[in-house]
Amino acid sequence: MLTLWTVSLFLLGAAQGKEVCYDNLGCFSDAEPWAGTAIRPLKLLPWSPEKINTRFLLYTNENPTAFQTLQLSDPLTIGASNFQVARKTRFIIHGFIDKGEENWVVDMCKNMFQVEEVNCICVDWKKGSQTTYTQAANNVRVVGAQVAQMIDILVKNYSYSPSKVHLIGHSLGAHVAGEAGSRTPGLGRITGLDPVEANFEGTPEEVRLDPSDADFVDVIHTDAAPLIPFLGFGTNQMSGHLDFFPNGGQSMPGCKKNALSQIVDIDGIWSGTRDFVACNHLRSYKYYLESILNPDGFAAYPCASYKDFESNKCFPCPDQGCPQMGHYADKFAGKSGDEPQKFFLNTGEAKNFARWRYRVSLILSGRMVTGQVKVALFGSKGNTRQYDIFRGIIKPGATHSSEFDAKLDVGTIEKVKFLWNNQVINPSFPKVGAAKITVQKGEERTEYNFCSEETVREDTLLTLLPCETSDTV
């Protein structure tokens, strides 16, 4: 697979020609900007629809496990299926060397059925994707035209509004969605899941996914390091109205296992091999999958850079709020700004990936001593583990703050537990405390204050309860 991703970028894999035309799809040439450029040096034409053999596999709430095939050549197959005109329609489009019946594609439909009634159409173009990369990148044009043709049939034959269509594309599939969107006026939404870099980054907008392809375009970047020398398959180029860079967008937590542990994976040899070769690249659809069932677990913060985000410079959310990366990104009030918007967040290293960000500020009390301070939050929905807030000289009256990403939303915060230690034997048995701890959840601007007049020895928990009104002034 690694060889396919790297070497095949430079293989020809098809005969050249000037232009080819297909019924209902239009004509495709090997002229610029599609070929003969520095980014696309090889002059290739896309394969024919017959050779690519794109299939449209419909799953609905009524048939969540067995698909119904919709045929471009026979629009009556739509009317004979469980397709419901009153529902939204979400197309899921796989990428390079993948297939429309892959587990993650079908699982995405199944997750949707848990939260909504929807027409979920898996676009299978495996015969066009399981070839050399450069040829597959050119086949994107025909597959995108076919997706647009299917939408056009829905519009003309079933009075279906394109505003109710959502295209979700991974890797090359993101650019398939872009091609389809550029052919479909009024398309509602496109989600690009780590749009691939090679042959697309730096090209004109008509070649790649861009914000003009739908009324709303959101993009998740998970493998945006340069292809050479880091083998980053995804693009770093801003491609939507909202671009999300989880964990900085280049190196995902949990993707640095050794080769054997990654390949001998719980999901099997094939899944394990895929994860070893393209773990960062695949994380984008795994985050989206989980976001469907976690409507508030992927809050993302506007920030100039991931460095600023990690330096706690982008907290809390601004007045208009923060978007949720993934399925619910379209709920964000500020989604349709004129300028592209960049957002950052952190995730877990494995399922569950969702995280909830908190800021904790504390005022120390007690003796001056060197050590580290930790805090745990307890709320109506559960409690966090202990998180490091400060290491260094613990000085009475000093204020320290830090942010952390918890594995759960604790709900209404009821109390805070404070712990300190210096891991050095101190015969004077000093006592330290927190006179006040202020907690703020990322999506909220409200601050919650907890107070205590007590001090404790190291490795002894101190519980702080909500301050009396006079204590918070």
UniProtKB/Swiss-Prot annotation:
Q: Which stretches make up the PLAT domain?
A: 356-470
Q: Which GO terms describe its biological process?
A: cholesterol homeostasis; fatty acid biosynthetic process; high-density lipoprotein particle remodeling; pancreas development; response to glucocorticoid; response to peptide hormone; triglyceride catabolic process
Superkingdom of the source species? Eukaryota
Q: Where are the transmembrane segments?
A: none
The record's section on CDD domains has: Pancreat_lipase_like, PLAT_PL
Under Gene3D superfamilies, the record lists: alpha/beta hydrolase, PLAT/LH2 domain
Record-linked Pfam families: Lipase (PF00151), PLAT (PF01477)
Q: Write down the SMART domains for this protein, in alphabetical order.
A: LH2 (SM00308)
Q: Which InterPro entries match?
A: AB_hydrolase_fold, Lipase, Lipase_LIPH, Lipase_N, Lipase_panc, PLAT/LH2_dom, PLAT/LH2_dom_sf, TAG_lipase
* Glycosylated residues in this chain: 157
Q: Where is the signal peptide?
A: 1-17
As for what it does, the entry says: May function as inhibitor of dietary triglyceride digestion. Lacks detectable lipase activity (in vitro).
Q: What is this protein called?
A: Inactive pancreatic lipase-related protein 1
- Point out the gene that encodes the protein: Pnliprp1
